[in-house]
Amino acid sequence: MRSTRSKLLSRGIAAAVTLPLLALAACSYGSEAKDDTKAKVAAGSEKIDGLDSVKIGYFGNLTHATALVANQKGYFQKELGATEAKYQTFNAGPSEIEALNSGSIDIGWIGPSPAINGFTKSKGTNLRIIGGSASGGVKLVVNPKKIKSLKDVKGKKIATPQLGNTQDVAFLNWIADQGWNVDANSGKGDVSVVRTDNKITPDAYKSGSIDGAWVPEPTASKLVAEGGKVLLDESTLWPDKKFVITNIIVSQKFLKEHPKAVEAVLKASVETNKWISANPDEAKAAANKQLEADSGKALPADVLDPAWKSIQITNDPLASTLNTEAAHAVKAGLLEKPDLSGIYDLTLLNKVLKADDESTVDDAGLGVK
């Protein structure tokens, strides 16, 4: 039997590290992104694996920049040929995992916590992490009038996106490292941890109902635009200042039956990341344009610019940090120790990277045997 805390985690941790800035979902899974993919299909192209379409999911967050840019610039469609790239946008991890399990999407960009939770709940049968996408982009932003140093966080009200999500677990772990005590489930203790949806966190900050927030981008930069101060960048707590914020997952069934299609999507991802690195300003504009297309609202420059700078695009899933994030959840009492063996299958990604003369990546011993 799962413990009460584990049940709470299954509702919370799957909400994902990259929770929504924008309200995108219009149905139970997400909303179809507006696109003109048919117009981008090259004449004479052939279908991959005989598929009419490949269904790709992602969040309307800058931490999903690879998917945003690849959609906007047509990289997915280019690699899929006459197989149509179809898109769904999501605003929470559980709905994307549900969509993957039901076949509503085949491949998705998602945070580490829902990937861990989806994998463990299915006893390792529903998904594989097949690549990385982004690192960083998480900050502790506070009201500088109330909090002037890290020790001042004690006794204050600090928001995280959701019980058991990646930022929530990271903040609880940081609190414990300070020697302070907080009940993980209630959020009560030496610090009041206030679980607040990212959509309303800026308003909660403006109203004074919270004193700060441990949140991903671009929510962090929205708080700064409202007068907040970055007190801590989570990247400073990790070796080499790198930790996974977004991974690429695939249905195990789809991976087994359509490896060529999966390889095509991974090739598009690698090519997109290369283009982003070479053209950061154009890529930033492309990501924002896709956000606007998906949601009807682009980010203002005072939010977009600092948020973009704090996110590192990467092909590496940073597997060792996923294991550490799971250990933090166990330490907080929000997760029973998971068996993550087999959560990664980086075979196709490393094939693509080798063909592109790029460095291959490691699964930290958590790959398919």
Language model feature labels by segment:
Residues 34-194, 211-214:
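Short, glycine-/small- and polar/acidic-enriched structural segments
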Residues 2-16:
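Bacterial N-terminal signal peptides that target proteins for export
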Residues 187-190, 194, 199-289:
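Pocket-lining segment of extracytoplasmic ligand-binding domains
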Residues 74-82, 186, 236-240, 308-318:
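Short, solvent-exposed loop/beta-turn-alpha elements that line the ligand-binding surface or hinge
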Residues 22-26:
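C-terminal motif of bacterial Sec signal peptides marking the signal peptidase cleavage site
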Residues 327-369:
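Conserved C-terminal helix/tail region of periplasmic/extracytoplasmic solute-binding proteins
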Residues 256-336:
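Secondary-structure end/capping motifs
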Residues 28-31:
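Bacterial signal peptide processing site
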